[in-house]
């Protein structure tokens, strides 16, 4: 009985140390290849860097953002996409902190453009979100689409989905894209997409925050009840879910290292 008690105390201590002091700090770079049918040569090895769920609430989070910027710039991505939840709705940020965030995000380098969609936390202070992203040279895609050309006449169509309304504004298709790249905060919205053969990048789930070995994430929330892990094939669409960087109400992540994501396009 005493041995069992010691084991329990040890496991609880391990969970506390990992959940509060190890996993919420730092981050990893998760890299994946995305294979695309009939990918033009111009898009071979095209790099997409995804950042999600920063959920910045204090100066420590800002310092980590500086490290993210440094690692991101080392990788020299072609485009950068942010899939929502920039500032935690509960924060103690000052005006100076906000300006620091803008300067860091502005100095994120890529060959082409930076895109963003709006997360549920961003909706709670949309004016602040718009101020930061617009001043950081991110194009906010709020239920709208844009075409990305790169060394070729055939573009990628990039669409951003709002967390309030899953269906993007209908656009008259004047060009045939290589594929549709869909950016959305809520991964569960994949079930309602009108696209086919799309590649969707999302966040929000934090991969369940607490991940139990051989089981997976255990905390599911609105917008990420069905799809919380790395990758899913849903009909003809491919869904990639980032575990993101931050935490919400409690700075706790167990067995769940924060991450930024790099996707390389390759011809199938």
Feature roles, as predicted:
Residues 1-42:
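N-terminal membrane-anchoring alpha-helices
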Residues 35-49, 138, 146-159, 175-177, ...:
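Beta-strand-turn-beta hairpins that frame and shape the catalytic cleft
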Residues 42-141:
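Membrane-embedded segments
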Residues 48-50, 81-83, 158-160, 181-185, ...:
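Structural motif
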Residues 55, 86-87, 120-122, 145-146, ...:
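Catalytic metal-binding/acid-base residues of hydrolase active sites
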Residues 78-79, 115, 138-139, 156, ...:
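Short, Asp-centered acidic motifs that coordinate Mg2+ and/or phosphate
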Residues 131-138, 144-145, 150-184, 188-195, ...:
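Binuclear metal-dependent hydrolase catalytic cores centered on His/Asp/Glu-rich metal-binding motifs
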Residues 187-264:
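Conserved beta-sheet core of the metallophosphoesterase superfamily
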């Amino acid at each position: 009985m005493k041995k069992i008690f010691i084991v329990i105390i040890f496991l609880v201590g391990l969970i506390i140390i990992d959940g509060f002091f190890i996993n919420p700090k730092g981050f990893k770079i998760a890299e994946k290849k995305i294979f695309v049918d009939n990918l033009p040569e111009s898009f071979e090895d095209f790099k997409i860097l995804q950042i999600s769920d920063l959920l910045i609430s204090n100066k420590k989070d800002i310092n980590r953002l500086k490290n993210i910027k440094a690692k991101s710039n080392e990788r020299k991505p072609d485009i950068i996409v942010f899939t929502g939840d920039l500032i935690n709705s509960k924060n103690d940020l000052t005006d100076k902190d906000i300006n620091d965030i803008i300067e860091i995000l502005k100095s994120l380098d890529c060959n082409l453009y930076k895109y963003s969609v709006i997360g549920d936390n961003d909706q709670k202070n949309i004016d602040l979100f718009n101020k930061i992203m617009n001043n950081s040279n991110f194009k906010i895609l709020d239920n709208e689409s844009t075409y990305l050309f790169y060394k070729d006449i055939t573009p990628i169509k990039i669409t951003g989905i709002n967390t309030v309304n899953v269906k993007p504004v209908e656009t008259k298709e004047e060009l045939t894209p290589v594929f549709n790249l869909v950016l959305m905060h809520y991964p569960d919205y994949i079930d309602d997409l009108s696209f086919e053969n799309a590649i969707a990048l999302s966040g929000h789930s934090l991969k369940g925050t607490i991940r139990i070995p051989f089981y997976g994430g255990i905390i599911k929330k609105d917008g990420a009840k069905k799809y919380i892990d790395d990758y899913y094939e849903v009909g003809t669409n491919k869904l990639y879910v980032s575990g993101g960087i931050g935490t919400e109400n409690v700075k706790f992540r167990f067995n769940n290292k924060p991450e930024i994501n790099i996707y390389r396009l390759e011809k199938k």
